[in-house]
A protein has these predicted regions:
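Short, structured helix-loop element that forms part of the nucleotide-activated donor/catalytic region
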Residues: 67, 76-103, 188
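Short hydrophobic beta-strand element within catalytic cores of glycosyltransferases
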Residues: 145-148, 158
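Donor nucleotide-sugar binding/catalytic pocket of nucleotide-sugar-dependent glycosyltransferases
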Residues: 1-28
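A conserved mid-protein helix/loop that constitutes part of the nucleotide-sugar donor-binding site
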Residues: 44-67, 165, 173
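Aromatic "clamp/platform" in nucleotide-sugar-dependent glycosyltransferases that forms part
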Residues: 109, 128
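A short, well-ordered alpha-helix in the C-terminal region of glycosyltransferases
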Residues: 35, 174, 181, 188-203, ...
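Conserved acidic donor-binding segment of nucleotide-sugar-dependent glycosyltransferases
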Residues: 160-161, 165-172, 181-186
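A short hydrophobic beta-strand element within the catalytic core of glycosyltransferases
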Residues: 123-124, 139, 146
């Protein structure tokens, strides 16, 4: 990704009690934004941001949410994006589950995704193929660890147990195990959250990436 991420814009520092704008939802602190979303402070919240289609791994993620529900686990999924009916739509029944289940908080497409990262604990990004996924960079910059598939791009940003977890694409059981691990290891997730931002600021900051790209071009010229 030639652009990297703007770590000043994607920063949790913009979301504090002091930044709450009266009458404007999704501003302020994690607690305030969760309240806007009808999520409680105690909820463990996974987030997905992107096109809600099959090749983003959404059928597998839905299967995991159904399994949590069956086991009586009150795990929340914050879903940000659009359902697509033409290109690679979800399996029958999965869209309905995601739209109607009380453990799924569906907010549709959002031009500013930062408040939703603030409300979440872990990004789930079970995509089958990516270039260099902006959403994983953005999550990291916001201090959110990620569960990603072992594919190009994702596995360059996420290092196992440092700033997230990695599992094989299209493997719903493996995804479920990683999600369960996150829920059972909340203290580790807090450490990973801090490390997540550090990794992005260190390696994928916009200026850093531009500088590296420029140096590559200079080498080619010589």
């Amino acid at each position: 990704n030639i652009n990297g991420v703007d770590v000043d814009y994607f920063s949790p520092s913009h979301f504090t009690t002091e930044t709450r704008i009266k009458g404007k939802p999704y501003t302020g602190s994690k607690q305030q934004i969760r309240k806007d979303l009808n999520l409680s402070d105690d909820d463990f919240v996974f987030i997905f941001i992107g096109r809600i289609v099959g090749d983003k791994g959404m059928n597998e993620l839905t299967a995991c949410m159904k399994k949590f529900k069956k086991e009586g686990k009150d795990i929340k999924l914050l879903l940000v994006g659009r359902f697509e009916s033409e290109l690679d739509p979800l399996d029958a029944g999965n869209e309905e589950f995601l739209r109607t289940n009380e453990n799924v908080c569906f907010v549709g497409y959002q031009s500013d995704v930062r408040p939703f990262f603030v409300a979440a604990d872990v990004l789930v990004f079970p995509s089958y193929r990516e270039g260099f996924p902006n959403v994983v960079l953005q999550a990291g910059a916001m201090g959110i660890p990620s569960i990603v598939t072992d594919i190009n791009g994702c596995n360059e940003i996420i290092k196992e147990d440092l700033n997230g977890k990695i599992f094989p694409p299209k493997d719903a059981d493996a995804l479920f195990r990683e999600m369960e691990w996150c829920i059972d290891n909340k203290d580790r997730i807090k450490v990973m959250a801090l490390q997540s931002r550090e990794v992005i600021v260190d390696k994928f900051r916009q200026e850093e990436v531009w500088e590296a790209t420029l140096n590559e071009y200079r080498k080619l010229e010589n």
